[in-house]
């Protein structure tokens, strides 16, 4: 089989003779779309790409209808990394950073000291779920692995990479007892697939998923499922920005317009699109007329 030409997708796979499943993610165009909207230093680009890969892997592994949000926060040079991915596989991401404090060779603990990772599942129907753990690991791959150690009974490992404008990720997870009823056999099998994944070299991540999986597990019966395409999309809109003004209340919204010299600018932190509202726009909002799509919007 030839490598798939798609650049942005997740693909699940399973070991037919082991109680182990996996998932691969490839992000080229969507990662590039995020980076094109901001001038991030290289360490920020890399961490944001890794977080995008992890988010896509989690969406691919879960069955829900809604939005998954990952936030990494700290009091350090990178106070925030944030990625959102919907069950429709639309992804966006952003970061906040202190430019003068970003050395090129800084470690995760230096860039995000005393950080924590928050996972939020916001379903279309049902109750919202949120879990927070410390950023415990030398890199984001270790942090996500440790997150799952604390939150799930099944062994789970992450490998994340974002270099050369490409974001990649690999997830391995031990399945409930089925093909391998013996405890020792299950543990040996798990350690075997993990040990092979650890041999991945940085330069190999850019290779096709099927080539890489064959190189790692050519002695195993590995079954690939259909790919799930991903794409960049920002959910911001003039309507949502107008709703943010409405939430302030009419008096405060009008006062804000005056304080801003007659026009309020609302910027999307994800895609950098800017929405402008003057006094007549705000009056229309509170008169129940909604937002005027023809009003000025800038990139």
Swiss-Prot record:
One of its GO terms (cellular component) is cytoplasm. One of its GO terms (molecular function) is unfolded protein binding. Keywords: Chaperone, Cytoplasm, Disulfide bond, Redox-active center, Zinc. It is found in: Cytoplasm. Disulfide bonds join 234-236, 268-271. Its main location: cytoplasm. Under oxidizing conditions two disulfide bonds are formed involving the reactive cysteines. Under reducing conditions zinc is bound to the reactive cysteines and the protein is inactive. Signal peptide: none annotated. One of its GO terms (biological process) is protein refolding. Gene3D superfamilies: helix hairpin bin (1.10.287.480), Hsp33 domain (3.55.30.10), HSP33 redox switch-like (3.90.1280.10). CDD domains: Hsp33 (cd00498). PANTHER family: 33 KDA CHAPERONIN (PTHR30111:SF1). Belongs to the HSP33 family. NCBIfam families: PRK00114.1 (NF001033). Redox regulated molecular chaperone. Protects both thermally unfolding and oxidatively damaged proteins from irreversible aggregation. Plays an important role in the bacterial defense system toward oxidative stress. This is 33 kDa chaperonin. It comes from Pseudomonas putida (strain GB-1). The gene is hslO.
């Amino acid at each position: 089989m030839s490598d798939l030409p798609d650049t942005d997708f997740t693909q699940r796979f399973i070991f037919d003779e082991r109680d182990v499943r996996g998932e691969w993610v490839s992000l080229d165009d969507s990662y590039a779309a995020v980076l094109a909207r901001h001038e991030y230093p290289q360490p920020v680009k890399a961490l944001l790409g890794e977080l995008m890969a992890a988010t896509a892997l989690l969406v691919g592994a879960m069955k829900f209808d809604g939005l998954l949000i990952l936030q990494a926060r700290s009091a350090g040079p990178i106070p925030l990394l944030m990625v959102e991915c919907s069950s429709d596989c639309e992804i966006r991401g952003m970061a906040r950073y202190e430019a003068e404090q970003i050395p090129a060779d800084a470690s995760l603990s230096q860039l995000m000291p005393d950080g924590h990772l928050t996972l939020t599942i916001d379903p279309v129907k049902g109750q919202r779920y949120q879990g927070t753990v410390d950023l415990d690991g030398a890199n984001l791959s270790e942090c996500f692995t440790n997150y799952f150690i604390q939150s799930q009974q099944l062994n789970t490992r992450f490998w994340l990479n974002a270099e050369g404008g490409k974001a990649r990720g690999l997830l391995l997870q031990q399945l409930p007892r089925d093909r391998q009823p013996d405890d020792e056999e299950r543990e040996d099998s798990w350690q075997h697939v993990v040990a092979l994944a650890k041999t991945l070299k940085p330069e190999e991540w850019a290779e096709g998923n099927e080539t890489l999986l064959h190189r790692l597990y050519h002695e195993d019966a590995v079954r690939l499922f259909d790919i799930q395409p991903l794409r960049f999309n920002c959910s911001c809109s003039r309507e949502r920005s107008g709703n943010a003004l409405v939430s302030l209340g009419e008096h405060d919204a009008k006062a804000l317009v005056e304080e801003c010299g007659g026009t309020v600018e609302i910027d999307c932190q994800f895609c950098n699109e800017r929405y402008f509202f003057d006094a007549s726009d705000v009056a229309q909002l509170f008169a129940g007329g909604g937002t005027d799509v023809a009003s000025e919007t800038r990139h």
